[in-house]
Structures are given as structure tokens and as C-alpha cells.
């Protein structure tokens, strides 16, 4: 009896497992572990492949672009949005004829098909990376500088993907990243950062006078900004000394003039003249006041 009860219990457990597995297959979903990464150059084509079982007549396919908000790319057997004019369906796959940088992101295809146990859903995820060539970089080059000072030139591009590297040119000749390897006719005190695009002269000299341009380059392409001239002049020490001497002479002449006027009594005469005018005005006022008082009494 004990053996029979054990056999019955095992049979019940096996039946339960079969039902559970069938339920999972019917109503669950499966996705490939390895996610695809598709790389495409901007304005060229890309194919987003959906790695699922073969398509059947009753299969239903949907493509979605994932992000902050999920948007349909292919829904109810029709491409959505601007994909209508620049994409086509090849079986379960999407062929984008003209990729733009805004297409970059994650996409998911969902395939549902009826089975004996119910509706079966499978999905696959594809990441699209769009490579973009640099635009014309913005270059900041000072028009003038004094020798011996620190001068920094800047170059930047905000569109390239992957991020570009930068190279500086002087009078059309490429500047080496290590200035010590260059000729003796160039200033070896500069520092070039190919990642950030800065060119810094620790002590700029007259040898650095010239036309500077910058090139941004990545695996897709390169662009260069128009050249800008930088003029480096020596500090005019003799001119500064001459200006200081002239100012000192002017101040000295003005001081001597004031002393001479005081000795000649120009300032004292002016004071006595002001005193006489004030006394005469006071006398006139007192007489008028007296006459007015007398007439009032009468």
C-alpha cells in the first residue's frame, strides 16, 4: 500500500510539472541573451534584424523604439512616423535607407503567434549606434599677444560621434603634439591637448606669429576651421619709460607754476579784492536799512 501511494504521488507531481511548463510556454515570453549592436554611418543605410522563429501567416509583428517614452516604429503591418518614407520591411527586419543621428537608440521587436497552448510572445532587442562626422569646429585665436605671456587657443566640435581628436596648424603646417621633435625655428614651449582641442603657449614669442587653424577628425571624417592670424609683439619698455617721464615733467611744470604764482602774490591780490567788494556791499546794505527804518517812523 505504501509503495502504491508513493507511485501515485510521483505521478501527480509529474502531471503538475507538465501543466506548469505548458502554461509557461503558452503565456510566457523568451528573449535572446546576446543583444545586437548595429553600427551605421549617418546618411547611409542600416538593417535592424529581429532574431525570432520563422514568420507564419498568423504571426503578429511589432517594432518599438525604447526611451523615456516608447514609440511605435512598425505597428499593424505599417511603418510609422518618418520611417514610412525612408525605411522598408524585409521579412521581420527593418531596412533604414537614410540613417540620421536621431535614430540612435534601442529598438525592440515583438512577435506573437498562436500555439496549441495559447498565445506565444517572443522579443529581441537591437541597439543602433550612429557614427557622425565632425562639423566645422569653432576656433578661438587671439588677434594679438605680448611676448612672454601665456596664450591659449581653443578648438571644439559638438557634433562628431565618436568624439573627434584635434590637430593645430600654423601657416598650413601641422604642429606636432610633442614640440621638442619639431624644428628649431618654432617655439617649443607650447602644449597641445588632442582630446580637448587646446593649444597653450607657456611663454609666447615673436616666432609664434602666424595664421592658426584647427582640424577635428574621427573615424567618419574630418573638418577644419578657417585660419586666423595671431600677431605677437615685444613689450615696448622704452615707450613706457618715455611716457612716464613726460607725465612727470608735466606734473613738475604745473607745480612750479603754482609756486611762482604764490610768490608773485596773484592769489593774495585776488583775496584782498574779494574782501573790499564784500565790505562795500555791507556798507550799502546798512545805509538802505537805516533809510527804511526812518521812513517807517515818520
Swiss-Prot record:
Disulfide bonds join 50-109, 155-214. Changing residue 82 to A: No effect on binding of JAM3 or integrin. Residues 1-28 form the signal peptide. InterPro entries: Ig-like_dom, Ig-like_dom_sf, Ig-like_fold, Ig_sub, Ig_sub2, Ig_V-set, JAM2. Residues 29-238 are extracellular. Glycans are attached at residues 98, 187, 236. The chain crosses the membrane at residues 239-259. Residues 260-298 are cytoplasmic. It is found in: Cell membrane; Cell junction; Cell junction, Tight junction. One of its GO terms (biological process) is negative regulation of myelination. Highly expressed in heart, placenta, lung, foreskin and lymph node. Prominently expressed on high endothelial venules and also present on the endothelia of other vessels (at protein level). Also expressed in the brain in the caudate nuclei. It comes from the Eukaryota. GO terms for cellular component: bicellular tight junction; cell surface; cell-cell contact zone; plasma membrane; protein complex involved in cell adhesion; somatodendritic compartment; tight junction. SMART domains: IG (SM00409), IGc2 (SM00408). GO terms for molecular function: integrin binding. It is a single-pass type I membrane protein. Keywords: Cell junction, Cell membrane, Disease variant, Disulfide bond, Glycoprotein, Immunoglobulin domain, Membrane, Signal, Tight junction, Transmembrane, Transmembrane helix. Pfam families: Ig_3 (PF13927), V-set (PF07686). Residues 32-127 form the Ig-like V-type domain. The Ig-like V-type domain is necessary and sufficient to mediate interaction with JAM3 and integrin alpha-4/beta-1. It is linked to Basal ganglia calcification, idiopathic, 8, autosomal recessive: A form of basal ganglia calcification, a genetically heterogeneous condition characterized by symmetric calcification in the basal ganglia and other brain regions. Affected individuals can either be asymptomatic or show a wide spectrum of neuropsychiatric symptoms, including parkinsonism, dystonia, tremor, ataxia, dementia, psychosis, seizures, and chronic headache. Serum levels of calcium, phosphate, alkaline phosphatase and parathyroid hormone are normal. Junctional adhesion protein that mediates heterotypic cell-cell interactions with its cognate receptor JAM3 to regulate different cellular processes. Plays a role in homing and mobilization of hematopoietic stem and progenitor cells within the bone marrow. At the surface of bone marrow stromal cells, it contributes to the retention of the hematopoietic stem and progenitor cells expressing JAM3. Plays a central role in leukocytes extravasation by facilitating not only transmigration but also tethering and rolling of leukocytes along the endothelium. Belongs to the immunoglobulin superfamily. This is Junctional adhesion molecule B. It comes from Homo sapiens (Human). The gene is JAM2.
Amino acid at each position: 500500500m505504501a509503495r502504491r501511494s508513493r507511485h501515485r504521488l510521483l505521478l501527480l507531481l509529474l502531471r503538475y510539472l507538465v501543466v506548469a511548463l505548458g502554461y509557461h510556454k503558452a503565456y510566457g515570453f523568451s528573449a535572446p541573451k546576446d543583444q545586437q549592436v548595429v553600427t551605421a554611418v549617418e546618411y547611409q543605410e542600416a538593417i535592424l534584424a529581429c532574431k525570432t522563429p520563422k514568420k507564419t501567416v498568423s504571426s503578429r509583428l511589432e517594432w518599438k523604439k525604447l526611451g523615456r517614452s516608447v514609440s511605435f516604429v512598425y505597428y499593424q503591418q505599417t511603418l510609422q512616423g518618418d520611417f514610412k518614407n525612408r525605411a522598408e520591411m524585409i521579412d521581420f527586419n527593418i531596412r533604414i535607407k537614410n540613417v540620421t543621428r536621431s535614430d540612435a537608440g534601442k529598438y525592440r521587436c515583438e512577435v506573437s503567434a498562436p500555439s496549441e497552448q495559447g498565445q506565444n510572445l517572443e522579443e529581441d532587442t537591437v541597439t543602433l549606434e550612429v557614427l557622425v562626422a565632425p562639423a566645422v569646429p569653432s576656433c578661438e585665436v587671439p588677434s594679438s599677444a605680448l611676448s612672454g605671456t601665456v596664450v591659449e587657443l581653443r578648438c571644439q566640435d559638438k557634433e562628431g560621434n565618436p568624439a573627434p581628436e584635434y590637430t593645430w596648424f600654423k601657416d598650413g603646417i601641422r604642429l606636432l603634439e610633442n614640440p621638442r621633435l619639431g624644428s628649431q625655428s618654432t617655439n617649443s614651449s607650447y602644449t597641445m591637448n588632442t582630446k580637448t582641442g587646446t593649444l597653450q603657449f607657456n611663454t609666447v614669442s615673436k616666432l609664434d606669429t602666424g595664421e592658426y587653424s584647427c582640424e577635428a577628425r574621427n573615424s567618419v571624417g574630418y573638418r577644419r576651421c578657417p585660419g586666423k592670424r595671431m600677431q605677437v609683439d615685444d613689450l615696448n619698455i622704452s615707450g613706457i619709460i618715455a611716457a612716464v617721464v613726460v607725465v612727470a615733467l608735466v606734473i613738475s611744470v604745473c607745480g612750479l607754476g603754482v609756486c611762482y604764482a604764490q610768490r608773485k602774490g596773484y592769489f593774495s591780490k585776488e583775496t584782498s579784492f574779494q574782501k573790499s567788494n564784500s565790505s562795500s556791499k555791507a556798507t550799502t546794505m546798512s545805509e538802505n536799512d537805516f533809510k527804511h527804518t526812518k521812513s517807517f517812523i515818520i
